[in-house]
Amino acid sequence: MIYDILYKRLKDAFDNIVTTTELKDLSVSIQKRHFTSGGTNLFRTSASIPAGDNNFTGQPDPQFLTGINDYNISSNNIFEYYSIQNTGCSQSEGIIFLFHGLNEKKWDKYYPWAYELARQTGKTIILFPIAFHMNRAPYAWSDSRLMNKIAIQRANKSSNAKSSFINAAISERLENSPQRFFLSGLQTYKDFCALLKSIRMGFEKNISPGASIDFFGYSIGAFFSLLLLMDNPNKELDNSRLVIFCGGATFDKMMPVSRYIIDLRASTTVENFFEQQLDNKPLLERRLEHYFRGMSIDRSYFASLISQKHYKDLREKRLHQIHERISATALVKDEVVPPSGVSNTLTGGPGNINTRLDVLDFEYPYNHVTPFPINEKYKVQVDKSFKLVMQNTSAFLA
């Protein structure tokens, strides 16, 4: 089935799912699964923090737009995630977690990706939302009229660019509290570990307790997936593989300023905040130790993925150990995560780490946000490129 038709077929199915839907024409079934996050205490006022470290948490300020604090945003705490698997699979022996990009609120573009991965690998694909993204974000953050007012206010601020109703909510939140970038990632990390524990205990329907775990990470989802692979929580990911698409660079080598992602002031604030943290290593170590206490995690791996120059030896030592289980694809015209940034990170700058990295250039207009556009004029070329990427991905993860 050609890509644009597949996209429309899957979107209709996902949009109308209640709990489980079988698509006989595509030989797959889709499930909507319930999840309750246990990581909400990260955002509570009462959470104890190291003496003198209040600036790192910046928590909690009154929640932008909804009038409540982050830890009380119910959509972020209790939500559904999707899974897709081949029809007739009573108990999946393999899982691929698919993690999305920054500031995304709809899964639409990922449906064909998940379908092809399931069809070609025979594994169950789990589309799991990062904290405060997708259906974990309040509806108000997608209200175009409300967000347009915020965008206009932000556009009138000095030294700002690329403000839009699409990025208004996340830009306002990150400029107000840049540490949210870290805390939302940490909550998602805890959620992943909780879901994995549930799988191992046999609580997840149609998934074997001993199922293998692999990852497909796009954009900031690649950043998160790489962190998981480096950390290897509870030694669960010793044999896991990761495919990176349009991602894989340290944060300082990304250029997320876009009307679809975040505006200039938000990007600058986040970058400056973490640069200041990294420049005071003893204080940063204390803060990270506080948040990672009780978790089987090397607290410095997160810091090593923020900046090329900080924790470089730690990052490259770990990448040497796991590079054979990573395959990355970058796009020539990707201005958000340029191939040069991906190469510098995954191959160690001078190329002394043999991580597989393919750099592609498609035969139609594309960008980071829309690598496979729904475009009647270029539908044949888009289908060809989509199938190439999915075939390479599936071959590595099968």
Which sequence ranges carry the predicted segments?
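Low-complexity, serine/threonine/proline-enriched polar segments
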Residues: 12-45, 131, 149-160, 165, ...
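N-terminal cap/lid segment of alpha/beta-hydrolase-fold proteins
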Residues: 19-90
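Phosphate/oxyanion-binding active-site loops and adjacent basic polyanion-contact surfaces
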Residues: 73-77, 181-192, 378, 382
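Short, surface-exposed "cap/lid" segments of acyl-processing enzymes
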Residues: 84-161
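Alpha/beta-hydrolase active-site loop
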Residues: 143-206
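Hydrolase active-site cap/lid region
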Residues: 203, 207-211, 215, 226-296
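Conserved alpha/beta-hydrolase "nucleophile elbow" surrounding the catalytic nucleophile
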Residues: 217-219
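Serine-hydrolase catalytic core
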Residues: 263-398
